[in-house]
Amino acid sequence: MDSSHNDSSSDEEGIDSNNRRHHSNHQVQRLEAFFHECPHPDDSQRRQLGNELNLKHKQIKFWFQNRRTQARIHNEKADNIALRVENMKIRCVNEAMEKALETVLCPPCGGPHGKEEQLCNLQKLRTKNVILKTEYERLSSYLTKHGGYSIPSVDALPDLHGPSTYGSTSNNRPASYGSSSNHLPQQSSLLRRPFTRELINTTPLPKPVLLQHFQQLSQLEKNRMFEIAKNAVAEVMSLIQMEHSMWIKSTIDGRAIIDPGNYKRYFTKNSHLKSRSALQSHHESSMEVVVVQMDARNLVDMFLNTEKWARLFPTIVTEAKTIHVLDSMDHPRQTFSRVVYEQLHILSPLVLPREFIILRTCQQMKEDLWLIADVSCYLQNVEFESTAPICTKRPSGVLIQALPHGRSKVTWIEHVEVTDKVWPHQLYRDLLYGGFGYGARRWTATLQRMCERLSLYSMTDFPPTDYPGVVKTIEGRRSVMSLGERMLKNFAWIMKMSDKLDLPQQSGANNSGVRISVRTNTEAGQPPGLIVCAGSSLSLPLPPLQVYDFLRNLEVRHQWDVHCQGNPVTEAARFVTGPDQKNNVTFLQPSSVGEYKLMILQDGFIDALGGMVVYAPMNLNTAYSAISGQVDPSTIPILPSGFIISRDSHPSSSEVDGGSMTLLTLAFQIFVTGPSYYTDLNLKDSATTVNTLVSSAVQRIKAMLNCE
């Protein structure tokens, strides 16, 4: 039997070898087609195939035997791979469940689970109550003795250990240590006083009254708005057409700015805007022309929809809301107007946000040409943040021309009058006054980058520039890109850090010091509870591109990123988000760090004005949810940290590589605890930890870049 079996095997191998040598392409294609229909042909079918293809009966028989064997081996291999993947997922889920059981919290109070922990926490609260009562009695006795009046009884005071006062912050605005940056506590008093809840300001920050309650516009006000809109459209169009007579070159950086003499001669007579003294305010004007990868009609729609507008400019627009939608104007061309509130912020907590109430008008000039004009308008009972500069947007706008192949030519004009209530920080003063802060170049650079990103996002297959790695589906690719975009938006939002606490002992000539803020998060997409954020800005004598490449260099990342714990990092997936392959979103995999394994999602970009590198650690379970593409990425909780890189706009800066100086802002966030359980000790330890993280990261990065 063995010899017959061996003879049969050798015979089969010989025939298979002959098949490979002698079967023509036509014969193989016909056999493959028949195999897909009937993998087990009977004797008559084999003879029929042999006659048709001029093959022997044994050749047909052994070909089908070999083909069935190949198919069985392939299926078994695919099943084994699928089982391994499923087994890995189950192991990761088990590890995540074990980790969750180790850190389980009590649902009613958010505290540690277990009777002993509850008793310990209760004892701490009782001890604290005794201390507070003693302090109250001392202060009450002192005031009664020296001031002639007393304080209400302790029983009349609100329960300091009841529901969290952080829950009262509106719209998730930061509730911060200390007061605003203009009235900082002195260093000595800060070091002497205990780091308790009394140092935390949880009062909701002032919002424009109009956004909380506003009335419908009267017909008289609407008519006035229509007239303002008509004048704004005419002025913006004139500024574009009068390029040679109305625009001059800046003596500082050579960019195009409006000639103030000609502008005053032509336009200010009929303006509804009030001019301020030149000693109190300054004008910022600029114009840029770019071509973007987006259809003109889609672009117009995104400009008129405030939600899409905020998404199109995630690193500039922090808030946007449509207040009034006005009826179409009585005009031969299609025209739409609306009143919009927007808050803008860029680069660093040292840069104050700007707020506007804008009348935005869109008018179709030709079949393939649209003009969108913005101009500030005055509404009653509007109050902005107390420290924000007074900003008036003089007629500005965008001319959008449709081009072939789904592209658009965009001419952007930005013209703003700014009255600063607080002198800008010296690190960013030249950049803001030079026009690179909120100028047209920043808007157009962001527009180009986002249009390219949206174009790549909508692709139905992996482009050759991508490295999918662990991401196997196009849905997973889109999920990762969407998560990276939301991470950039969230990180840009926290940069406002309104009402922050400066630590002056950390400050230096080229360093802003460390600023800390605390907020209670209740929004989806971020961990619910208390979050501490610390940030710092500094100047580096290096071009922005060099700093950007350093922060993305995986070979040295473990030397400054605490999430790596000193272990090397590898790239698990990479998706390019623009024509420059340096702009990408990546999944990074640190080497095994004890029992807790994680992945890091990172999104970064670089353009003519600077860039960002933003990242967030994820446990493997959350990372697999993002990679699978089966989960809505907006529901995946992320807490981003990262860096904002900006060119220094100082007149002495070189244009090579975006300038010879870089302004770098870094910010780290720490999740303290859930929404219903925290102590002063938690806040103190977390603030100290995040302050140490920022300070040590600054020192390490400066040392590695030889900038000490």
Swiss-Prot record:
The keyword Nucleus applies. Transmembrane segments: none annotated. Its main location: nucleus. Residues 218-456 form the START domain. Residues 1-24, 162-188 are annotated as: Disordered. Residues 16-75 bind DNA. Residues 119-141 form a coiled coil. Keywords: Coiled coil, DNA-binding, Homeobox, Nucleus, Transcription, Transcription regulation. It is found in: Nucleus. One of its GO terms (cellular component) is nucleus. Pfam families: Homeodomain, START. Residues 165-188 have a biased composition (Polar residues). CDD domains: homeodomain (cd00086), START_ArGLABRA2_like (cd08875). The keyword Manganese does not apply. Expressed in exclusively in anthers with highest levels in the tapetum and pollen grains. InterPro entries: GLABRA2/ANL2/PDF2/ATML1-like, HD, Homeodomain-like_sf, START-like_dom_sf, START_lipid-bd_dom. One of its GO terms (molecular function) is DNA binding. Probable transcription factor. Interacts with ANT, BBM and AIL1. Belongs to the HD-ZIP homeobox family. Class IV subfamily. This is Homeobox-leucine zipper protein HDG10. It comes from Arabidopsis thaliana (Mouse-ear cress).
